[in-house]
Regions:
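Conserved N-terminal segment of class I S-adenosyl-L-methionine
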Residues: 1-108, 130, 159-188, 193-208
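A conserved beta-strand element that flanks and buttresses the S-adenosyl-L-methionine
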Residues: 115
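Hydrophobic adenine-recognition pocket in adenosine-nucleotide-binding enzymes
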Residues: 119
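A short, conserved alpha-helix within the catalytic core of class I
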Residues: 123-132
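Conserved beta-strand signature within the Rossmann-like core of class I S-adenosyl-L-methionine
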Residues: 138-146
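Short "lid" loop at the C-terminus of a central beta-strand within the Rossmann-like core
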Residues: 147-151
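Short aromatic-enriched loop/helix-cap "lid" or pocket-rim segments at secondary-structure transitions
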Residues: 152-157
C-alpha cells in the first residue's frame, strides 16, 4: 500500500469539534444515540470467539466507554493527538494510543473484531482505509456511517448546514445503505448483518 501523505488530505480531523458527540442532552438526539448503541450491541452479540477488539477513531473515547463492558482485550486509537489524553482519561483501564487508520500499528491478522464508528465518511480514501483494516483484522468489522440522503434531510429539517444542503462539516463521503453494503463487500468481506437506526447504517462483516 502506498504511504498516505496526511498533509495533502482534505480531511482535517484536528480542526473538527467532537466534544459532546454522544452526550447531547436534547431528548430526540439522546433517543437516537441510544438506538445507535443498541444496534452496535446487537451486532457485537452476533460475533463468535472474539478474544480481542480494537476501535479506530475513538475521538474522546465516548463510544469506547459505552462498549468496553461487552468486549475483552479491548483497545482504542485516535489520529488527533490532543484527543488521545482525553480518551485515556475516559478509559484509564484500556490501551489507548495514537495512530492513523491508513497506517495501523497492529500486526496482520491480529484483531478478532475491529470497530470503526462514524469515521469512514470523514476520510479522503475510504477504500485504502478498509484495505488497511482488512490487513490487521482476523475476523470481523463493525462499521457505521450516516445513512444518506436521510442524514442531510434531517439536518435541513432542523435548519442545520443549509448552505451545504444539510451536509455536516467534515463529511466527505455519502452512502445509502445499499451503496455502503457494496463498499464493504468490495473492500472487506461478507456482510453478515445490517442495522439501520435512524439516521445511520451499521454493518457487521466477516473478512474474506
Amino acid at each position: 500500500m502506498n504511504k498516505i501523505d496526511h498533509k495533502k488530505l482534505q480531511a482535517k480531523p484536528e480542526e473538527e469539534d467532537f466534544s459532546g458527540k454522544y452526550e447531547n442532552s436534547n431528548f430526540v438526539a439522546k433517543y437516537l444515540v441510544e438506538n445507535y448503541f443498541k444496534s452496535v450491541e446487537k451486532l457485537i452479540a452476533l460475533t463468535k470467539d472474539v478474544n480481542s477488539a480494537h476501535e479506530i477513531g475513538i475521538g474522546e473515547g465516548r463510544s469506547t466507554m459505552r462498549l468496553k463492558h461487552l468486549l475483552t482485550n479491548f483497545s482504542g486509537s485516535e489520529f488527533v493527538e490532543k484527543l488521545v489524553p482525553v480518551a485515556k482519561k475516559n478509559n484509564p483501564e484500556l490501551n489507548i494510543f495514537q495512530e492513523s487508520v491508513y497506517e495501523l500499528k497492529s500486526k496482520s491478522n491480529s484483531i478478532d473484531l475491529v470497530l470503526l464508528l462514524e469515521v469512514l465518511e470523514h476520510l479522503d480514501h475510504p477504500e485504502i482505509a478498509l484495505e488497511e483494516i482488512k490487513r490487521v483484522s482476523k475476523k470481523y468489522l463493525i462499521v457505521g456511517v450516516p445513512n444518506e440522503p436521510l442524514w442531510r434531510i434531517l439536518n435541513i429539517s432542523r435548519l442545520k448546514y443549509l448552505k451545504d444542503l444539510g451536509n455536516t462539516p467534515g463529511h466527505l463521503n455519502h452512502w445509502s445503505k445499499k451503496e455502503f453494503k457494496k463498499v464493504i463487500e468490495q473492500n472487506y468481506g461478507n456482510v453478515i448483518a445490517i442495522e439501520s437506526p435512524i439516521p445511520w447504517t451499521i454493518i457487521l462483516a466477516e473478512k474474506y
